[in-house]
Amino acid sequence: MDKLIQTTAAILAGIASFMWGGMDGLLYALISFMILDYITGCLVAIVKKELSSKIGFKGIAKKVLIMALVAVGHILDTHILGGGAFCRSAVIGFYIANEGISILENAGELSIPLPKKLIAVLKQLKSKDDEESEDDKHDSDS
C-alpha cells in the first residue's frame, strides 16, 4: 500500500510540474490565497445565511479555471516562448492580486477593520497588472 501511495504521489508531482512549472513561492501564494478566498467567502455566506452549494461549486469552478490559466501561461513560456516564466508569473501575479482583494472584501463584509498597507499593496499589484494589460492591448491594436 505504501508503494502505491508513493507511486501515486510521484505521478501527481510530475503532472503538477509539467502543468504549473513546479511549486515555487508564487504558486504557494496563489494556492494559499485561493483557499483563503474560498473559506472567507463561505464564512460570509454562513454569517449572512446565504450559503449555497450552487454558489460554492461555482467558486470551486473558478479556482480550477485559474489553475488552468496558470498552466496555459507555463506551457506558453516553456514550449512556445522557449523558457523563462514571464507568462506564468504574470498570470499568477494577476490572480494573487484578485484573490487578495477578494479576501479583503470578504473581511469587510463582516465589518473587520482592514490594514491600509495591505489594501495599498494589493491595489498596487492589481493596478500594475491592469497597466500591463492596457499596454498589451495597445500593442495588439498597432
Question: Model-derived features: where do they sit?
Answer:
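Alpha-helical transmembrane segments of multi-pass membrane proteins
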Residues: S17, L30-G41, I66-H74, F94-S102
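A cytosolic-side transmembrane-helix exit/cap motif
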Residues: I46-I55, N106-L114
